[in-house]
Amino acid sequence: MEKLTGKRLFMLTFGIMMSLVVFGQQVRVSGTVTDAADRQTLPGVNVVVRGTLTGTITGANGEYSLMAAPGDVLVFTFIGYLPQEVTVGESNVINVAMRTDVQALDEVVVIGYGTVKKSDATGSVAAVSSKDFNKGAITSPQDLLVGKSAGVVITTAGGAPGSGATIRVRGGSSLNASNDPLIIIDGVPIDNNNVAGSSNILSFVNPNDIETFTVLKDASATAIYGSRASNGVILITTKKGSAGSPLKVSYDGNVSVANAIAFVDVFSGDEIRQLALERSDFFGIDNLNLLGLENTNWQKEIFRTAISHDHNLSLSGAVKTLPYRFSVGYTDQNGILKNTDMQRITGSLSLNPTFFNDALKVNLNVKGMNTHHNYGDQGAIGSAVNMDPTQRIFDGNPASDGYFLWANYGANLGTPNPVVQAIEVDNSSIVNRLIGNIQFDYALPFLPELRANLNLATDISNSEGHNNRPSTTSPNLTDPFYGVIYNYNATNKNNLLDFYLNYNKDFEGINSKIDVTAGYSWQHFEREEDNLREGTVGEEHPKYQPPRPGG
């Protein structure tokens, strides 16, 4: 038995020593990544030690630094460039010149009211296709693009289910006006103003339906859209059916679990009581009498383990000369804050027939969404940090539905019970949205290089919701109008007509090309909103109290 123990001890010691030797061989490798053609530095290049999770990205000057051992292989990857691998040798400095992916330059990208090859694009254009999207349980289209395009910063607005994001292309341009980019989906410019009750302007698009993002960053690329594109343009193209393709059925589903991984460090009930006793001369005897006997962790009481699931089904193919794609999706996302969730149903239909020997191309796109949001009360998070941990959640007082409230103990002002805020506040909405367009692209028979394009689109959103707060959630305990009833409904409409002519001809004899576009665009926005707000008196509970006439 002693020999076996000694052998195990020897093997453990040997393993530790070998680990130290291997670790000691690692050195800091640094360098600069440039473009092989013009020697310009490349920021945002991914540098990874092959076969490991060790990696970094190049900074604004194309510089990188990471730990690696001699013999390790560094893999350099960047969108639009060929991957490159370099083996770490004796030198600690490895500079890399990356070559452009010629095949990528031949790809067609959407720009303005047309498409061009990447090699012909004169402005700053970045295209991100579905194979480069972020992976995982993604329910918002913006999350697909995070970190995938240089100069595009996407910041999630919050952790609530279905929350939107702030998008900036090459930073902000104004202190007072909007800095949001113009977003165009399948040729339809989207209104950046959400309908009441919605928190994400892109929530109607199922992330699984998106084929590419194209980001137009500079003035030459965005000029055709006018001043509304001063903050950049993001073009979203959804998936389509292919001519001659057989029926293809695809299903994608996932289940995710979320937890609050950290809390604000606050005093426990015991620590509060000890501090109060030590400073009783400061707090006063009356305040000490209000201390409870509990050790309530209010933050843990308002958070939960949230289980969410997402399901997507699509059918694509072609019926003779009619390519089609149909998809439906269902998302049930629960928030880690109690009483917050989102249920969303999305549907899309795409038909892309051609006529007259492909001279006339028709694109029909229809997308619909129904979303039910429970927003809860975000104020419960702040109350949970500030609430007295010596108090219990329930004290049995029928005047407050059994919950502990400072009002029951004669206080005039106090932190609301965070559990009441999280559970009793009824802040929910139902949002419906329908967006569709039909586009005709016709090559004139007498001049094939000249194409006429007509795009007709409509975007309609409507919502109804309420934010009803019972009297038990008010911090002001002397005003008789404790509770609030707030009901609203809203409608946003957006109609579009685009018509333009495009002449595109190659003069191979002189190695030149002409591309001219002229057109007319009309867009009309209409918004309506009605709301009713009133206070409730005494013990009325607005969650169950209908609005009174004249309130």
Segments (PLM) and residue ranges:
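Surface-exposed loop/interface segments of Gram-negative outer-membrane beta-barrel transport/assembly proteins
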Residues: 243-294, 336-340, 346-435, 453-551
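Short, small/polar-rich motifs associated with maturation and membrane association
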Residues: 1-355, 360-369, 377, 435-436
